[in-house]
Amino acid sequence: MKKTALLNIALSRTIAGLGHGDILVIGDAGLPVPPGVELIDLALTPGIPDFASVLRAVLSEMQVERHVLAEEMQKVVPPGLVEIERLRGKLGKREWLSHEQFKVLSRSARAVVRTGECQPYSNIALIAGVTF
């Protein structure tokens, strides 16, 4: 059995397969998943699992070079934004896009991780870095 915090097989496998510059999106329950992009659906009930818990678990295994957020997040300030700020040292450089541009970016993702989060704009695109 694994020693790290992340137990979900599909998510762990996806992270292990990421290369430098690959994109992994963590999204709220309402974020559309583009056709052809793998969906890792963790949603169980509204709010479970929440965005922040999934982000922490992903960061336990993923090296992140930079991250992208929707500009609308700054106006709504969902609870996940507090966690993003707390984890900023593990997230690299920040970029802001409109929510529509964020959805276009998600077309290039290796996978979208769907959480049970129901707070608007609780989405982040993580761009993989390297550990060397």
From Swiss-Prot:
GO biological process, one term: D-ribose catabolic process
Protein name listed in UniProt: D-ribose pyranase
Organism: Pseudomonas putida (strain W619)
Quaternary structure, from the entry: Homodecamer.
Active site per the UniProt annotation: 20 (proton donor)
Protein's gene: rbsD
Gene Ontology CC terms: cytosol
Substrates-to-products reaction catalysed: beta-D-ribopyranose = beta-D-ribofuranose
Enzyme kind, highest EC tier: isomerase
Keywords: Carbohydrate metabolism, Cytoplasm, Isomerase
Primary localization class, coarse: cytoplasm
Enzyme Commission no: 5.4.99.62
